[in-house]
Amino acid sequence: MVIAIDFDGTITEQSFPEVGALKKDADVYIRRLWSEGHAIVINTCRSGKYEGMAEDFLRANDIPFSYINSNMPHLIVDYGQDCRKISADVYIDDRCLMGLPDTWEEIYNMVQKINQKKIV
């Protein structure tokens, strides 16, 4: 699956324009999702030097990702361009309608349930 993950408030504590502290176990569960073969796209409002700060943070904390603010190459080909909206199977964002679960373990378990439904 393609999993789009917000940065500020989701991977880190909200602290824009600075980079906040890593949320507990975000790195552990993002690495686990990556190791299971999921593509990770960082979907953030950060751009320019602020996007660079997020990328530096992710690399410094060994948090894997496929792209930042860019769609997967096969989707760019399918749509003939890299549209502004990130296309994903799952979106993890602190601003979602129902709110973000309290822990990354809960987030991970929800993604697993969605993935199982796709396989069936």
Residue spans of the language-model regions?
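Alpha-helical substrate-recognition element adjacent to the catalytic core
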Residues: 1-73
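C-terminal cap/substrate-recognition subdomain and adjoining C-terminal extension
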Residues: 51-120
